[in-house]
Amino acid sequence: KLSRYAMQNEDFKKIVGTVDMELPYSEMHKYLYLENQTNLLTTYPGVGGIKTGYTEEAGYCLVTYAKNEDVELIGVVLNAVNRKFDMLNMLDYAFGTYGIEVESGYE
């Protein structure tokens, strides 16, 4: 529910959906290149990002927002050996139940 609520905020949606960003040098910080670790943003059509994570208790985790046609999904993977692969399969299955075929960059 928290992710669904957060994705209603356009600023949040823009930030978590940003693939990469360059912050030029300033008096406050050196030059920074920031890259989103949710690489499904560039390989799975309709993915709008959200968050990767890891803790010893929860393992590798991934929360993902995706929209194709009129179907919006939020998937959550916890304690995954391969969170991206698990999410890819979950999104394919979920969109498939609505008759939506998505061609991702994954094999």
Where are the language model's segments positioned?
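Domain-terminus/edge residues, biased toward the C-terminal soluble/receptor-binding domains
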Residues: 1-107
